[in-house]
Amino acid sequence: MRTMAHASVVALLLTLSGCCRPEVMATQPVTLRPQETGMWCWAASGEMAMDFLGTNVTQCDQANQRFGRTDCCNNPVPGACVNGGWPEFNKYGFNSEHTSDAPLTWAQVQSEIFCARRPFAFSWHWDGGGGHMMIVRGYVTLEGVNYVYVNDPWAPNVGDQRIVTYDAYVSGAGYTHWDDYFRIARQ
């Protein structure tokens, strides 16, 4: 009986040791890719995520695929190519999941960044219409406040890296949370 109890404790410890225990801070080295037009935040976010995972897909190629065109890589970019959209990871050999009008929980943020060691894309919906997509590449908790590290492809050809509170990631003045693309991985 004692041997069986000992074996059960060992099995439990082995199981628990395989669980991910996120640290207070974690980041992933995601290269900032500014959006190349005023509307390609979605393509820049797709480019950042896929580039991090080892596949370089340009923003104009994503626009060509999204809009059924072949001229979005031209200079200047034709106006018909300059539209909003969503990343289409499946067209480039990736699987992903996405939320609808909901952010990832803090535990999910930690799991994606620390445990799975990958970034994820998120978007805000502006109160007046339209929206904006960015990448979360890290997180930290300081003095009881949760923050996320963001690669923001705005402004065109510039971009920005910043840290925002988790609460601001969820919603804020002038915007609500839209869709997140997470668990992005090769098929």
What are the residue ranges of the model-derived segments?
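Proline-rich low-complexity regions
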Residues: 4, 31-32, 43, 119, ...
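Bacterial N-terminal signal peptides that target proteins for export
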Residues: 1-9
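Conserved active-site-adjacent core of cysteine acyl-enzyme catalytic domains
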Residues: 25, 50, 61-187
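N-terminal non-cleavable signal-anchor helices
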Residues: 10-11, 58, 165
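Generic low-complexity segments that are intrinsically disordered, proline-rich and/or Lys/Arg-biased
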Residues: 7, 23, 30, 77-79
